[in-house]
Amino acid sequence: MTLPEETPVNEAVDTAFAIEDKVGVRLGPVVVNGCYPELALPAASATAAAAQADAQLIDVFVSDQEASDLAAAAAFRAERTEIQLAQADRLAAALPLPQIRLPFVFTSEIGPAEIEQLADAFVDGLAAL
């Protein structure tokens, strides 16, 4: 199990090779936990003007500062998703094992609904192997 971040990916690769080489255990799929869902929005298109236009579409007023803040948040989220995808791809290239990607749960507490969401994603990932 790993996270789609540089250091955890490095550690997963090193650990996997050590386990296979020293212990002789054949490894199964790698679970990549905390993956942000992909967005249709590239980071470069997250602008204050786009936030203002989107707000007008749903008839909501946002100030210039709010539009700027929304654009910054959207750009950050898109950049984080791109980084995660790149790290998961790097993991796949360095460690030729199937991956089961679990979603990031956007909540402060894990309850029954979140456990079900993660379990469903895990089962779907297994079925896709």
What does each model-found stretch correspond to?
Residues M1-A94:
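Conserved catalytic-core segment of NTP-binding enzymes
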Residues Q99-R101, V105, E109-L129:
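C-terminal accessory extensions appended to soluble enzyme cores
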